[in-house]
Amino acid sequence: MLAQQQPPTPTPTPQQSQPQPQPQPQPQQMSQSRKSKSKKKQSYYDEEVRTLPSGAPVDFGHGKKSTSKPKSKSKPASSSTTNFKLTASPSLPSGAKPNFQPYKSTSPSPPPPPPPSTQPSTSTSTSPTPRTSTGNKNHHNRHQSNHSDYDNDHPQLSLPNGKKPNFFNNNNNDKKFSTIPFDSSINLIRKQYNNPNTKAIKEKKLDNNNNNNSSNNSNNSNNSNSAYYAGSSFHSSPDALNLPKPSFKSNNGSPRQSSGLRDY
């Protein structure tokens, strides 16, 4: 028997070659994709902490909590704080702190008095407590010690015979006028200023015998009238009036200067 001829296979048309629409993903696949995205974000934020060459974590100051171990409280202070302390508290080469105010006592201040009791006092008159008296004594002693330290550092001036100099030129032998008083009042200063012996510039009496060589008798009379002179310059003294005055020619006048141009 003759073999049966198979019909030719039809060629696919362009309409038949189009891909079929894919089925919609199931809800489980959607949840898996979301989980993968969240894992990527977590891996981005949970990356390894960047460290310095010394091993310390890098802190950029963005407020993000570092995953490193918490810092111990017993960690030594940073170098910046130590430098600030060194500059704020200078010291001498010997190690002692300088005292820029010698009059102020370096001893600790006395403790404040206790607050008054709330209970009513039975006695109307209260006797002074011994603490106040001791406090006044301590303050007085510190004041004297400060003055003694100042006197040791700044010795007082003395004359070759051992006496203290008298800058006010007073004949009084009291100790008040021997040296400048420490706590002098305004009235005392005024008295010393008004005293003619205390003035720095004294009136100098001119000798009339030195003016006998003057040419005019009128000048001699002027010198006798101005017997006292307190100036410090010769040009302001009465003797400057005795100098010969220059004479100027009033007839001819000033010489006429010749100009370079000629009048034609």
Swiss-Prot record:
Places the protein is found: Cytoplasm
Pro residues bias (residue ranges): 108-118
Compositional bias (Basic residues): 63-74
Comp. bias intervals (Low complexity): 119-134, 161-172, 208-226
Domain of life: Eukaryota
Protein keywords: Cytoplasm, mRNA processing, Nonsense-mediated mRNA decay, RNA-binding
Positions of the UniProt region annotated as Disordered: 1-180, 193-264
Biased segments, Polar residues type: 83-92, 248-264
Keyword field contains Phosphoprotein: no
Cellular component terms (Gene Ontology): cytoplasm
Major localisation: cytoplasm
GO MF terms held by the record: RNA binding
BP GO terms, sorted: mRNA processing; nuclear-transcribed mRNA catabolic process, nonsense-mediated decay
Keyword Transmembrane: no
SS bond partners: none
Role description: mRNA-binding protein which stimulates mRNA decapping.
Family as reported in the entry's similarity comment: Belongs to the EDC family.
Record's protein name: Enhancer of mRNA-decapping protein 1
